[in-house]
Amino acid sequence: MGKIIGIDLGTTNSCVAVMEGGEPVVITNSEGARTTPSVVSFQADGERLVGQVAKRQSITNPDKTIISIKRHMGTSYKVDIDGKNYSPQEISAMVLQKIKADAESYLGESVTQAVITVPAYFNDSERQATKDAGKIAGLEVLRIINEPTAAALAYGLDKMDSNHKILVYDLGGGTFDVSILELGDGVFEVLSTNGDTKLGGDDFDQKVMDYIAETFKAENGIDLRQDKMALQRLKEAAEKAKIELSSSMQTNINLPFITADATGPKHIDLNLTRAKFNEITNDLVQRSIEPMKKALSDAAISIDEIEKIILVGGSTRIPAVVEAVKNFTGKDPSKGVNPDECVAVGAAVQAGVLTGEVKDVLLLDVTPLTLGIETAGGIATPLIERNTTIPTKKSQIFSTAADSQTSVEINVVQGERQMAMDNKSLGRFTLSGIAPAPRGIPQIEVTFDIDANGIVKVSALDKGTGKEANITITASTNLNDDEIDKAVKEAEKFAEEDKKRKEKVETLNNADQLIYQTEKALTELGDKVSAEDKAKVTEKLEALKAIKDGEDLEAIKKATEELTQEFYAVSSKVYAAAGGDPSQAGGFDPNAAGGAQQEPHDDNVVDADFKVDDDK
């Protein structure tokens, strides 16, 4: 069985880990970093960038750079790039493809299976969309687990002999979750979960952006938010200021030539204090308090019973957030986990549980939202209450609302509101063939089945006729099987293009390196090389130079090999008499051409890894 990777597919950054020797290890990406920006950028020539290289050029290419796509998972949102629409699943799959490739490079083997985390408060549509993204990227998603639960796994793996209750406060780039868990004897039981899928670090950035923009507008009469390039510079500066204010009491925001008018160029030079930052973002911090209260209430425990507070997500580095949690709980948060990496580490632990590498661990998670159906009068009738341990299955008997009714439409809803229309409709299906009878007589058994991923299946059975209908919830906002298959094929095609482009870059790197080494060595050896031998080497050298910028990679490889062999033969003659090492001829190393492949930070090699020409 191959390795199963654990992926934290984040709003702002993503992280991947794997179990090695019984311990979870965070995998560094091709740029040498432990996290990868969840950013995708499309270039004018159709090429595609993912990760840090995409983020670096977002200011100059704001229209075709996609950030925070996770906030649109499970919705009908589309990204229009040059007339082609991309779903959130497809954009997320591009990020997952890079993560998958980085993991394969690290492990030295193909990776086809993964455990992916989602915010605990993600609904069914959002979970299904995440699973679809994995499939498009070429990954079989064995398990979807909640981020706070994953963090608890990372925290509690070495503390399984003790019994205690913990509160996980997870404030990421785009979502907020809070979960109450009980740990003991290898069992990680989620008692309750709550959250806000529209609260995260992006919102803190937006507050700072608005503050800068309003200050500038008051002074200059220009709204920078109407200029896409200026807006992107504002976003980058706001994020940088937020990060700096986590460790400093004041930061300077300096953006020269941000715009211009008839009077000339305009600049931003603004000092932002931590006190001011806390003031403009206080409402966001306070929004996280109510979900904590609800989670404690649902778990039926008091704050005094919580023994440990775990902070997860990069946004928990904001001092005001830490202070708010401390004030609410009366406890100092634990420093035992890395907020950026612990979710991926926990996902890797869960992967280890699935493979049997991690033993004596049982994870009991819950469904975050109430599930039910719409009944007479538009009422949402619950079947499975929120915070029910999953997997679970529950049935309930319903009947017809009219005389001689031969079919019923069942509207599956998810949410906490009393009326069905106020909740999220996950899907509809029809049970036909009901025997005509007075209303209230037919017995229709509706069954909800939630698997360990939190994904829902619903069935309806007419107990009188035996007629049955069922639905695996795939809301209209998700991709159907044909769309997923099409996206998978496109992703495979792009992966093949990536492979070819990388091979081309490496072949050209090898040729360039060899040409440089040969010319350098010939100059340094001078008269030690006979005219006849020099002519032979020069002939092969010129032959390689003539074709190295062409498209025939096999010819370039052949010419590279021929030049290598020819020069090695010549240098052997020169050094044989002196008893030297021919590989040291003028610093020449016949294998040095391959050295270009060993430089992971070479821009050409790295960028080629994840550029795709959509027109091919």
From Swiss-Prot:
Query: Origin, by domain of life?
Result: Bacteria
Q: Name one GO molecular function term.
A: ATP binding
- A Pfam family recorded for this sequence: HSP70
Q: Where is this region: Disordered?
A: 579-616
The keyword ATP-binding is annotated on this UniProt entry? yes
* Entry-annotated residues carrying Phosphothreonine: T175
Is Phosphoprotein found in the keyword set? yes
Q: Where is the composition biased (Basic and acidic residues)?
A: 599-616
Which residue windows are coiled coil? none
Question: What induces its synthesis?
Answer: By stress conditions e.g. heat shock.
Per UniProt, the keywords (alphabetical) are: ATP-binding, Chaperone, Nucleotide-binding, Phosphoprotein, Stress response
Q: Which InterPro entries match?
A: ATPase_NBD, Chaperone_DnaK, Heat_shock_70_CS, HSP70_C_sf, HSP70_peptide-bd_sf, Hsp_70_fam
Q: What does this protein do?
A: Acts as a chaperone.
Q: Spell out the family assignment given in the record's similarity comment.
A: Belongs to the heat shock protein 70 family.
**HAMAP family for the chain:** DnaK
User: What's the protein name?
Assistant: Chaperone protein DnaK
Organism placement in taxonomy: Bacteria, Bacillati, Bacillota, Clostridia, Eubacteriales
